[in-house]
Structures are given as structure tokens and as C-alpha cells.
């Protein structure tokens, strides 16, 4: 089984097809009577020969074939079992259900009568199987982005499909950490603390689900519909009422279903989710019995209060380069506003793109539907034409049959006349010998003409039947070609729509990559600004430390001078020279990199960078 962690205890890819359906077998008692009519004789291996008894003439009519196959219900019989697997990793969209039929060998019964010959064929279905194809993935699946608690903040940032590669903020010593947390750097810190791992894991699971669905579809056998074995066209259907036995069986299945737990568990084991219905539910880690494991809030109010006090204290202690900090705060706020405007623009573009895609799909579906309707209309017209041709052929066959009946009637009358003539010749044998010879010759000629007429009528009937069959086959072939053409046009329209959607997606990905590149450049620029500000703060701190050291040295020198003066006052007065000696003041040597303007250099750097940014925006 495959669980949420992605770990599997069996091979995910196997040559054995995955079972994703149920097979139900029920006896069917509903019947449909199909009548096959033909106006021409059907030649088969079993035929009834014409027998003549004495002077009696027997004429057989065309064979009438009557078949009575059992009715096959083309509806889906859902399993009454309460076992249902509804938790899947993908959405199920318009899963068509196919029904297959299997028939036993037809049983044929022959009538013992020879006038006319008939036979009956019955098809009894042994079972039928209904299955649902594998699950299909839809790109409309709602994507949920989860972030750890450590990355949450009061400012919510909408996740986007663009990957943002973040780097941790460089740590600085405590005495140089002048910038308080949450003051000015809140937007940038929250943006850099977002985790791209959730987006990556969502994309990985989506690709894995699509691959598994494709493998299941490849290994699922598609059972073809069983076709009828009779070569005769179906001309009509006769429906009989449903039997009470089927209704009783359905009620019994609903009220008292027969279940096989081991088999059901075996079937469920093929699904990518565990059978949570037959196992004990997982205990809630936050149940009342576990008081010690109660979830802690995201931010402790006491901790928040302490942080606020620390921030206020650092603000009071912050006395160096307040103007520079204001500039940094203004720059970061400007970057935050630009990012928010960019997100609003992306959201509007996404909505517009979704609307255009929906309209394109709707138009493609309408075109495909219209093409299918036109193809169906053309096929119906061709079928009507074929039916008219078949009716015309049937009328011609009927006319030929009437001609055959007239010929048979004439033959019967000739036979009666022949018998009367024979009787008359027997009575007047002595008187009309020459007349009898003439009548015999006329009777022979007339008989030959009757046989020739009968043979011609039979050949004409066979020819008309053959033409009708060819016309019907041509009509059926034309209808099938029209249906195939409509399906091909619909498929071409669908491929065109998919191609347009793919091109739109490629353009959108290119635009998103360009935006990602611009955003990364902006982040790098902000990081450089922050790095330069930290370097400037470190330099100023070093200068202050050097000034403090020099001041301490001056204070020590002054203290030594005062002590020396006090010692000199206690000694006798010594005459000083006439030329006064100038006292040299202590020289304070500063580094060459120290400037007298304090934070003005940092302000000049910021102004230069702002001017460069404005020039880039104008370009």
C-alpha cells in the first residue's frame, strides 16, 4: 500500500495490471425479439427439398427467420456492497463506464414441417462485466500550500509558482546589532523566511500521481463489445415486460447483501490509500486525555511583550545614523509596495488568462458539438436515402412475385385445359386423330414457355434481392464513414485547443521566469545595500571606539599633568627662562579612512544608489 509519506511496501510499477473495478454477474431474464425478414430464399446446408406426390404440385414460399435472443440490459449495476473507496490522490472527472457482453453458443431449433421451413435461434448471455477506467488527473485540482509554524508571521504572503531561492541572514556581533527586529526589516525578513519546499513537494506528488494514473490506464484491458453472429439486418425490436424475478433479486441484494471480507480487502489493497473503514481510526494527538501535549500558540503573548520592551529599549539606545535607518526603512517599504503591486498585477493577469482559457474551451466544445450534429444529420439523410432505395427494391421484388404468381396461375389453367383436352381426345379418338396431334404439340410448346417464364422470374427475384443487399451495405458503410469523419474532426479540434493552451502556458512560463529574474536582481540589490549599511555601521563603531580610546589617553595625560603640577608647587620656585616655551597640544591621529562627516558618506551612497534605481525604472 502507498501512504501519505510516499513510502511503499510493494513495487509501484508492475507488469500485472492494477484492478480498479468490480465484476458482477447476474442472470438476465428480460427478452427482446428480433425479426429478420427477407423476400428471397436463403440457401443453407440444411434445406427441405420439394417433393411431388402424383399430380399434386407443392410450391414453397421464402424462408422467414425468427430469432429470439435474450434482452441485454445496457445499464450499470452498481455493487450493493457498502465498501466504497472514495479517498484518492486525484479528482475523478467524467469517468465513462463500459459494459461488455458475452454470449453462449446459439441453440438452433428446426421445424419438422416442410411447408414453409423455419428455424429459431436463441442467444442467452452468461455474464456481463461493468468496469470503470482509471482515475484521470485534472489541472483544476486545488493546490494547498502548507508552511511550518516557524515561518508564519502576521504579514501573509500569497504563494506563487515562482521558486524563490533564499539565503540565511548573516549573523553579526551583539554590539553591532543596532537594527531591532520587526523595525523596518519586517517585510524583507518575512519574505526571505518563506519555505519553497512546500511548492516543490506539491509539484513532485502531482507528477507522481499523473505517472501512476498513466500506468494504470496502460495496463487496464479494454474489452470490446460482442457483435452479433447473424448476417441478417435488424428490422425491429419487441420489448417484453421485466420479470418479477429480477426485481426480487435486486431487493434481496439491497436488503441482505452477500459480502466476502477477505476478497474485498484484497481488492482494496490495490488502491493507493489504506482501507481506513476496516481499521481503527488514528487517535487525535490533541485529545482531552493528553493535557501535556496541548498545542502551543504560534506566538507566546509574554514573549511578544518582552520582545516589544526590548525593541523600545533598543530604539531609545539607537543614536547613530537615525537618518540612514530612516532611508533603509523607506527603501524596504518601497520594495514591499512594489512587490504587493506586482502580486496584484499577477492575480489580475491570472484571472484574465483563466477567463480566456475557459472561453476558448467553450468555443471549441461548441464547434465540436456542431460538427458532430452536422455529421449525424448527414448520416441520417444518407440512411433515409438507403432506406428509400431498399423500399424501392422491395417493391420491385413484389412486382416480380406478382408476375411469378400470374405465371403459376396460367400454368394451372393450362394444366386444367390439358386434362380436359386429354379427356376429350379419349372420347373422340377415332374421329379427331389429327386434332389430338396438334393439341399435343401446342401443349408441349406452352409447357416449355411456362418453365422458361418461371425460371426468368426466379432469376429476376434473386437479382433484385442481391441489389437490395448491396444497397443496404453501401448505406451502412456510408454511415460508418460519416461517423468516423465526425470523430476525426472532433479530435482535430480538441488537439488544436490543447495546442493553443500549451502555447499560452509556455508564454506564461517565460513571463514568470523573467519576473523571477527581476525579483532576484532586486533581492540581490537589497542584500548589497544591507551589507554596505552593516559595513558602514561597523566602521563607525570602530571610529567611535578609537575616539573613546584617544579621549581616555588624553584624560590620563591631563591627570598626570595635574599631578605633576601639584608636585611642582611643593618644590622651591625656579626661575624660568625669558623665552617662553610653547606647550604642544596632544595630536590625535585618526585612520586615513575616517571622514569628518560621520554618517554623511553613507547618506551620499544611498542617494547615489537611489538615483541609479530611478534611472533603471525610467529605462
From Swiss-Prot:
Residues 570-581 have a biased composition (Low complexity). Disulfide bonds: none annotated. Residues 602-619 have a biased composition (Acidic residues). Residues 285-304, 333-373, 389-504, 558-619 are annotated as: Disordered. Residues 393-418, 425-441, 448-504 have a biased composition (Basic and acidic residues). Transmembrane segments: none annotated. The modification Phosphoserine is found at residues 79, 81. Keywords: Phosphoprotein. The keyword Phosphoprotein applies. The keyword Transcription does not apply. Signal peptide: none annotated. This is Uncharacterized protein CG45076. It comes from Drosophila melanogaster. The lineage of its organism: Eukaryota, Metazoa, Ecdysozoa, Arthropoda, Hexapoda.
Amino acid at each position: 500500500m502507498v501512504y501519505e509519506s510516499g513510502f511503499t511496501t510493494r513495487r509501484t510499477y508492475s507488469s500485472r495490471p492494477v484492478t480498479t473495478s468490480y465484476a458482477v454477474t447476474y442472470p438476465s431474464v428480460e427478452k427482446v425479439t428480433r425479426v429478420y425478414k427477407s423476400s428471397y430464399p436463403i440457401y443453407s446446408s440444411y434445406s427441405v427439398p420439394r417433393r411431388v406426390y402424383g399430380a399434386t404440385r407443392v410450391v414453397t414460399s421464402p424462408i422467414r427467420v425468427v430469432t429470439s435472443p435474450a434482452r441485454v440490459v445496457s445499464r450499470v449495476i452498481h455493487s450493493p456492497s457498502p465498501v466504497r473507496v472514495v479517498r484518492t490522490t486525484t479528482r475523478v472527472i467524467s469517468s465513462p463506464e463500459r459494459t461488455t457482453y458475452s454470449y453462449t453458443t446459439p441453440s438452433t431449433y428446426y421445424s419438422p414441417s416442410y411447408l414453409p421451413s423455419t428455424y429459431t435461434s436463441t442467444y442467452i448471455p452468461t455474464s456481463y462485466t461493468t468496469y470503470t477506467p482509471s482515475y484521470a488527473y485534472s489541472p483544476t485540482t486545488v493546490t494547498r500550500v502548507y508552511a511550518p509554524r516557524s515561518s508564519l508571521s502576521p504579514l501573509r504572503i500569497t504563494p506563487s509558482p515562482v521558486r524563490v531561492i533564499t539565503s540565511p541572514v548573516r549573523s553579526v556581533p551583539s554590539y553591532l546589532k543596532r537594527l531591532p527586529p520587526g523595525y523596518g526589516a519586517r517585510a524583507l525578513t518575512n519574505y526571505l523566511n518563506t519555505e519553497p519546499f512546500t511548492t516543490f513537494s506539491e509539484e513532485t506528488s502531482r507528477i507522481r500521481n499523473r505517472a501512476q494514473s498513466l500506468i494504470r490506464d496502460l495496463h487496464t484491458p479494454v474489452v470490446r463489445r460482442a457483435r452479433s453472429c447473424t448476417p441478417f439486418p435488424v428490422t425491429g425490436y419487441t420489448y417484453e415486460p421485466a420479470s418479477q424475478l429480477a426485481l426480487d433479486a435486486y431487493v434481496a441484494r439491497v436488503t441482505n447483501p452477500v459480502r466476502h471480507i477477505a476478497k474485498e480487502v484484497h481488492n482494496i489493497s490495490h488502491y493507493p490509500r489504506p482501507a481506513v473503514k476496516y481499521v481503527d481510526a488514528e487517535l487525535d494527538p490533541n485529545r482531552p486525555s493528553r493535557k501535556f501535549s496541548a498545542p502551543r500558540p504560534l506566538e507566546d503573548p509574554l514573549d511578544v511583550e518582552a520582545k516589544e520592551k526590548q525593541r523600545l529599549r533598543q530604539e531609545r539606545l539607537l543614536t547613530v545614523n537615525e537618518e540612514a535607518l530612516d532611508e533603509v526603512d523607506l527603501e524596504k517599504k518601497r520594495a514591499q509596495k512594489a512587490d504587493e503591486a506586482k502580486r496584484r498585477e499577477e492575480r489580475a493577469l491570472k484571472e484574465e488568462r483563466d477567463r480566456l482559457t475557459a472561453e476558448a474551451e467553450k468555443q471549441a466544445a461548441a464547434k465540436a458539438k456542431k460538427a458532430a450534429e452536422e455529421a449525424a444529420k448527414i448520416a441520417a439523410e444518407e440512411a433515409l436515402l438507403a432506406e428509400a432505395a431498399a423500399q424501392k427494391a422491395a417493391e420491385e421484388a413484389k412486382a416480380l412475385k406478382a408476375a411469378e404468381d400470374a405465371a403459376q396461375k396460367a400454368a394451372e389453367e393450362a394444366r386444367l385445359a390439358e386434362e380436359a383436352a386429354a379427356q376429350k381426345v379419349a372420347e373422340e379418338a377415332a374421329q379427331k386423330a389429327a386434332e389430338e396431334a396438334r393439341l399435343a404439340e401446342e401443349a408441349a410448346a406452352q409447357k416449355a414457355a411456362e418453365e422458361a417464364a418461371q425460371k426468368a422470374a426466379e432469376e429476376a427475384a434473386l437479382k433484385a434481392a442481391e441489389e437490395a443487399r448491396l444497397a443496404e451495405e453501401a448505406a451502412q458503410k456510408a454511415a460508418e464513414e460519416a461517423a468516423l469523419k465526425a470523430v476525426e474532426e472532433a479530435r482535430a479540434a480538441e488537439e488544436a485547443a490543447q495546442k493553443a493552451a500549451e502555447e499560452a502556458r509556455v508564454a506564461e512560463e517565460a513571463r514568470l521566469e523573467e519576473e523571477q529574474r527581476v525579483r532576484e536582481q532586486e533581492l540581490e540589490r537589497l542584500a548589497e545595500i544591507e551589507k554596505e549599511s552593516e559595513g558602514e555601521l561597523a566602521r563607525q563603531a570602530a571610529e567611535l571606539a578609537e575616539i573613546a580610546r584617544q579621549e581616555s589617553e588624553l584624560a590620563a595625560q591631563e591627570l598626570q599633568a595635574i599631578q605633576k603640577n601639584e608636585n611642582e608647587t611643593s618644590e622651591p620656585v625656579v626661575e624660568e627662562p625669558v623665552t617662553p616655551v610653547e606647550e604642544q597640544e596632544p595630536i590625535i591621529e585618526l585612520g586615513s579612512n575616517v571622514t569628518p562627516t560621520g554618517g554623511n558618506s553613507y547618506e551620499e551612497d544611498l542617494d547615489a544608489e537611489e538615483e541609479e534605481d530611478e534611472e533603471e525604472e525610467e529605462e
